[in-house]
A protein has these predicted regions:
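N-terminal accessory segments that precede or flank the first globular/catalytic domain
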Residues: 2, 18-44
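Bacterial N-terminal signal peptides
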Residues: 8-15
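N-terminal post-signal-peptidase region of extra-cytosolic proteins
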Residues: 23-28, 34-35, 52-81, 123-126, ...
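Exported/periplasmic cell-wall-interacting domains
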Residues: 25, 85-185
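Solvent-exposed coil/turn segments that connect beta secondary-structure elements
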Residues: 35-37, 44-46, 54-59, 82-85, ...
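Short, solvent-exposed loop/turn elements at domain surfaces
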Residues: 39-42, 50, 61-65, 87-90, ...
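Short hydrophobic/aromatic-enriched beta-strand-loop microsegments
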Residues: 49-52, 182-184
Length: 185
């Protein structure tokens, strides 16, 4: 390979790595306001981007989500997965259930010690927590895919995720990175 090619390749890698590091260094995070039905991207405490008319779980929200309840979990999470092509257009998975959710569920008898330990170990290792426990899983932010925009605008229709239009999720993809903080309130 020529020296010029290698220098060009190195320059491109530095630009891409620098862009990713810049996103993380600015303390960029997501706030989902389920009362106002708005998702905002913030840098510190300054709002950089807002997406209106989001949809949440068809049964509302809860601090204590259970598998199949169609509710969006409340709390503080991290993005653990970025899938650019899914049936819902794009999917940005969060680390639900968190240790806080698992602790409350253990105290309430919703899960046993074995599930609590599995969730605790996964979160501690910064891995995706088990998704098949009685607390449910596969929660994230996604588009509507081939779904109807009119239904999205009028109804909360998800099984617990946060949904944006495909155009909104495409725009949001410029901001997201694995490890990004997501607050759902």
């Amino acid at each position: 390979m020529s020296r010029r090619f290698l220098l060009t390749l190195l320059s491109l890698l530095l630009v891409v790595a620098g862009d990713s590091a810049a996103k993380q260094d600015l303390d960029t995070w997501i706030l989902v306001d389920t009362r106002k039905m708005v998702l905002s991207v913030l840098e510190g405490d300054k709002v950089r981007r807002t997406y209106n008319d989001i949809a949440i779980g068809r049964a509302g929200t809860t601090a204590d989500k259970k598998q199949g309840d169609n509710k969006t979990p409340l709390g503080e999470f991290r993005l653990v997965r970025i899938a650019p092509k899914t049936p819902f257009h794009r999917f940005f998975g969060i680390d639900y259930p968190t240790v806080a959710h698992a602790k409350r569920a253990l105290r309430a008898g919703t899960i046993g010690l074995e599930h609590y330990i599995e969730i605790y170990r996964a979160i501690r290792a910064q891995a995706i927590p088990p998704q098949e426990t009685p607390l449910g899983g596969y929660i994230g932010i996604h588009g509507i895919g081939e779904g109807e925009a009119a239904i999205h605008k009028r109804f909360n229709w998800t099984q617990g995720c946060i949904a944006l239009t495909n155009q909104q999720i495409d725009d949001l993809s410029r901001w997201v990175y694995v490890g990004m903080r997501v607050v759902i309130r």
